[in-house]
Amino acid sequence: MSCICLDTNWFLKGLESPCPPDWTALSALFSENSDAFSLPRFPMQVHDVLLAYGIIENPNIRGVNRDLWIHERDWVYCCRFSAQANVPSLLTFDGVDTFADVWLNGTLLGSCSDVYLSWEYDVGHLLRTENTLIVYFHAAQTELKKLSLPERYAGLVPTISAARVFRTGYHDYCGPSPCLIRCGLYAPVTLRQAEPVALAEITCDTWLTEDGDGVVQVQLTWMGQADTPYAVSLADAHGTVVADASGKTAHGRQRLSLSVHQPERWYPWTHGTPTCYTLTVRAEKEAVSRLVGFRQIDISDRLLFRVNGMPVRMWGANLMHLDTLTNCYAPEKMARILDLAQLANCNMLRVWGEADKLPEAFYEECDRRGILLWQDFFLGCSLYSEEEDQLSLYRQEAEMLLRTRKHHPCIALWCGGNELYLAQEYQHPEAPVYGEKIIREVFPEVCARLDPHRLYYPSSPCGGSFANDPQCGDTHGYTHLWFVPGRAYPHFLSENCRVSTPTWQSMNQMMTPDELWEEGTYALTAHHPCEIPESWMKHTPNEGWLKLGPVEHYRDAETPQEMVYRVCAAHAEYIHEQVGRFRRGRAPWENSDIRHTNGHLLWRLNENSNVISFGVVDYFLQPGHAYYEMKRCYAPVFASVALDDHAGIYLTNDTTRTIAGTVEVSLFHLVKNERTHQMELPFTIEPDATARLCTLDEWGQIRKEQIICVRVLDKRRTLLAETIQPLDIERRLAYPQQVGLSMIASADTDTLLLRCEHYARCVSLHGDGFDTLFDDNFFDLLPGETKCIRVLPSPSSGVIYAETAYDQTIVSCQWKKEKEK
């Protein structure tokens, strides 16, 4: 078989007025004298090409889209390629965004209108030795105006929900404003030719028997001549073949099973080794491989996950598409995002129902890393048409997603989509739940038929007496706008959000100096009812100023740096308080070992535009204050303080082993600059458990200008966990303004050592570029302690800066590695 990736000789041309659907007119657009753009790489969407040629600026840098003319035009791609004529051939488009006609050598192959589908065409009878492929994209807004829905949906189902497009391009919820509508080819275009045979499709299922043996069931679909030999093998992580089979490509389709005695099991990386096996199909000189794994996932009605019988609490985040400018997959950028997810102790990511379709490479990366995925189908926060033509599209999308992705051990569950029931309750509480037929009939039927071993979950959120009921099913953290009964210890938060700015360096990329600040102090008043400057609001989509953390706990800002700190520290405080409570999992007065909260997925991990929004990793892949607080709160061994009627010291163990050691608790007085009280006590804690180790009752009344400090040490005196808990809100505390911060760099060991003479509130580190990453940042530092920070990845040279929230002194050190001999 021969598989040709059509990744060269591509051209793009924009049209000020539509071109007639005629091959002569279309091919003339790409004559020798054409002013079409030659694509420097492929795939590229229209914005990618225009940016590469300097026609536009990247609207994501400032979060403002000025080039609306792009989505008002038709755009045409052309590719010239060589192939073998007169052999069975299949032309496949893995990503078409969105409304396009496909022409080959003068023949219209068909029209594309669903961005989530791959499009395949039988072209063997049309191919020549030299070929011309043209893909004509119609302006999306023009096509949307042609859509109509039956009268019963009027005012309930928006037109955009009848179109199968990337919805995020049609609103500014998570991108620049006004919205940025993408267009073009965003994934590979391939030509498979049967010489004499080609593998048209491979699907596989894996499961474990009751005896613990592994089964891989493979279905192969062939094109071309029959009776060509093929071989299938399954290799373990070391490359050793543990099962194989062979046959001939008779009748075009075969189903076969491979068995593995007691295979190594796949675990999320926080609880074991994510062991993968490689399934390979060979015919003639070609080979196609898939990663598979063996694991048993059971999920209770309270969404407690058990992986291979082991309870696993899910601590993670929602993953956004990487860039609003393009859906072309960027593996290096995604690798950085996944690195940051693991650095933050995340074992689950949610693939959001309104985000973009991700390629096989993403799922393989999650397989290898041991990151579990909550996988939504592509529905989002809207009611939907239930007409038969629409239901057929949803069915096709679900079938394609399952056939191509179900073999991945990283996928924990399929979910019907994002906020269908919530959209009905919030927007149209008296209306029927249009779209319920999709999530209650279409999707579950497809899942039961194609992937019966994996849980299907109807919608996120759903369950209980109302859609967002925290006490049944999953919930989304809308407590910034709503009072939600039962919110303190929900079963599972599949979203939970607050808004903050990106890092200070990224803010300077976003705004001009005049936008960043006007002289004066910003305070919430009747005449200024917003917590952020008005000039920031055009960079804050979706009314983000209503969704800040507890900024009222912080001093009013007199500079833009102080405002950035105020907003970001409030976001971090929200995570500290909320996730700390969820990790404990039960109220202090409960005499039980039950942990009510089984998972928390922060909304959201990453930003796809440089805006003020929910992401804790900004557009330039810089983690902010809230990210590092999430990292600390997701630590497998986690210490926390509950300030209710008593000050309780808690320890949570989400590892797989029993832990014993010593906990040190002290009070640090900010004004006296000393510890006023100290205690030390032993502890032992089982896996998957939370324990209240003590209260501070024996110290009686405690002055609120003190800080509770907790350090957890194992029996070898190795630090396992630590936390710092103020006794009052920050605007009432007198943090030192001269802390005597010092920093020493050891580039050869990739570390920084920091010390201070007085309590240092929120030590922040940054390099002289955007590439410097630290394993901890935005942390408090006590006098007498040495903080060791790893630099990841370590630059060869540069300058690293450190500063604190209240001391205006900036400390710096040179970073230079010795050259390797």
PLM regions with names:
Residues 4, 8-18, 41, 67, ...:
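Accessory beta-strand-rich segments of carbohydrate-active enzymes
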Residues 14, 184, 414, 447, ...:
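Substrate-binding clefts and catalytic carboxylate motifs of secreted carbohydrate-active enzymes
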Residues 56-80, 88-92, 97-101, 110, ...:
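Active-site-adjacent substrate/metal-binding segments within catalytic domains
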Residues 102-104, 213-247, 647-684, 691-694, ...:
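Beta-strand-rich binding/interaction modules
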Residues 125-132, 219-300:
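Extended acidic/polar, glycine-enriched regions
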Residues 177, 201, 402-522:
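Active-site region of glycoside hydrolase catalytic domains
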Residues 246-264, 666-703, 770-796:
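Intrinsically disordered, low-complexity Pro/Gly/Ser/Thr-rich segments with frequent PxxP/GP/PP motifs
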Residues 286-288, 698-737, 795-821:
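Terminal connector regions
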